[in-house]
Amino acid sequence: LYTAPDSCEGRCGEPFSEEDECHCHPECGTEHNCCEDHERHCGPDGFSSSRDSITDQELLELSERLYELDHNKARPGDIAINPQHLAGPDETGDKRDRSPQPLYKYVNEELFSKPTYASFIKLLDNYQRATGTEEEVTAEELREQDHFLREVMRTELMQELFVFLQGKNRYSSEQEFLQDLKEMWFGLYSRGDGERDSSGFEHVFSGEVKKGKVSGFHNWIRFYLLEKQGLLNYFSHNFNGPWDTFPDVLGLQFSWDGFYKEVGSAFIGCSPEFEFGLYSLCFLARPGRACHLSLGGHRLSVQTYPWTKSSYGSGRRFI
């Protein structure tokens, strides 16, 4: 469900946008359309003064910097893909396999021995894909979450993101940032009837099945590993980004063990920390809205959604 953000946390002084449910621009008081917590965050003593809001220009500049800092991404010879059929708008929903060959012709699996890749892959078998099935989190799985977070925070890319967010008064310490990432991404919430059956990480990276359709599932590593096992059948693509190096972006149609994904977009060839960092940035800066970025001189938008039915900490939302 799309819900515009209903808080001024981190939004003070941002320009008026009709997309928003409530507003945080300087004139909202006289226009009587401020968010309820406007005074708390944006008043003289508020946490989010206008200098702490994240501007559109800063998002463009920081995303370019994170793109440059993705030292663990695939090199040109590391991956060969075979996109085959380009589906038109009238074809994406008809569940026809128009590509006889797999999407991935070759992946240099030495990539997967890099610490952030290895710790990421360990997380992928921790989930029940069906929504409505309670997730049982073992002590080992909690250790795997902590290990992944430690590894990504060792990268220059995630350090750059942390320093930026700390400068915007979002976090006072790296430990606070790490703890919030853990809750935001791995905290469980219910997509069904009260069972704690989902998390941001499971939805975005591992994928879920809801009402007979694939939901989420935006990660190239997960796609490659399942395709290699014969559990995923690539059908077609409806978008191929303008990038001629990795990461690239594809819009995909595929079947996962008989369940269909009509349009699934994915970065191809980026490191786990790049995706994790970029999505975290967008969720913190533009929750529930399009987050406009620039990668290698090409524009792209990422849409994140806050889970509005439950929260953690003092009203923070899961991704």
Per-segment meaning from a language model:
Residues Y2-P44:
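Secreted, short cysteine-rich peptides and small extracellular cysteine-rich domains stabilized by multiple disulfide
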Residues P26-T30, S173, C270, S310-G313:
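Generic detector of ordered secondary-structure context
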Residues L300-I319:
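Extended hydrophobic
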Residues D45-G296:
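N-terminal "domain-start" segment
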Residues L1, P26, P44-S53, R316:
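Polar low-complexity intrinsically disordered regions
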